[in-house]
């Protein structure tokens, strides 16, 4: 089989120069990687989400498993190394950023009120964000109730297509 530039065939994994088999982009930590040359114009003045999957990854690789265009259209900025996961039920209506000082936080599933308050106070810097996340069957819509961390979840921004980022 002949692999062309537009094909998704990636038989070998060469760290920081090519892509992993299966189409997951790989890069060493602390560097921005463009998924393909045609997206460079779209992310010229924005940060690309940095995603870490698992705690003990060989050589501390970063894996990207996101739909880049939908994330960029939603203008989601996730800063630094985030160590929690979220699931959004509706699309984001405004720009927001999650600050990266999450290392010392204890996100225990089930303690939803405390987690939402902790995240809202320390990690969420936003304008008026009217989006919801599901927490135990209850939709949260106000900033004071936003984003209870569920450590087994994933970041999802839904608007027609599904964008996900695994941590």
From Swiss-Prot:
Organism: Escherichia coli (strain K12)
Protein name in the entry: Putative uncharacterized protein BicB
